[in-house]
Amino acid sequence: MDVEILTMKTTGDKILDRTLDKIGGKGLFVKELDRALLEGRSQLSVHSLKDMPMEVPEKLPILAFSKREDVRDVLVLPKGCDVLDPLKPIGCSSLRRKLQLKEIYPDMQVKSIRGNLQTRLEKLDSGEYSALVLAAAGLKRLGLENRISRYFDTEEMIPAAGQGILAVQGIDGLDYEFLKGYDDLQAHQAATAERAFVKYLNGGCTSPVAAYGEIKDGQLKLTGLYYEEKTGHYLKGYKTGNPSDAEKLGTSLAKELQERCKVEYKESGLQEDNKKEPGKVWLVGAGPGDVGLFTMKGAQVLEQADVVVYDSLVGQGILTRIPASAKLINVGKTCWPPYYVPGED
């Protein structure tokens, strides 16, 4: 079979100065490839399944799933280092990882990082970060397994739905008989359960929902993480069922965790406490942007903030103190006249 490879750079690859939840989510990695299929410029697209939206166009179905590679997330340290530097943040690109890292390394700061794998490793080795959290599969595919310092167990760091699986997408109505031998049944069933779990909870780039399915002894065990954005409460849980009922299993676990989260949150008394305790707004001066001149009180309120509004005068060292769960709002003011805020015009 003769194959012509059409390489493409997506919008998600081009916009690197903002986190994915601020620029439109995972759909930014597939739009250009979808357009190429619809316009007849290509007949197949290959994606990392974890980067695909939960909803795919009816005319562009997922045709096959590859055999799953190593599903785990890993810790990568700078070259020549064997311990974490507590003064520098851990870099990772997903809210799912940030949330779970807070359990594993509660005293470490976590900071977003974008770019392809080589770009991220260069930033790490230049001293910007104490470590990175990445997918093991991506490092192994590029022959960089020697950079891995620690593997996270799938129970302490639940992977993203579809992690370690490549998905083949095509055009509805075309003959893809040749793909039958490529589609891996176990990966297909596990991914179906994982994506059903996330889809029911409306999860994606803007919510740290996670799911991992594993088939053993003829049974599919699905482990999931549900996060309630309004309350900040989250739960992990699992459910076992028949692999042939993968979609139902995913939806069922999602419903259970969602209901349990509501009950536990209510029983904890946090709901009542939130009603009684009004929120506070703190005005914190960032000075000339030098973290060394930041006040202790400013650092304290920043580390406990739920929402942080900042402009371009603030230094990156100050931003690393913001908790991973906080919502960031960049008003975009420039540091020279005329001052400008997005939306003014």
Say what each PLM segment does.
Residues 1-9, 14-16, 20-22, 98, ...:
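Small-molecule-sensing regulatory modules
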Residues 32-33, 119-120, 297:
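Short acidic active-site motifs
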Residues 49-108:
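A conserved helix-loop-strand patch within extracytoplasmic ligand-binding domains
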Residues 87-88, 105-108, 129, 302-306, ...:
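Short, well-ordered alpha-helix to beta-strand connector turns
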Residues 275-289, 298-345:
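Class I S-adenosyl-L-methionine
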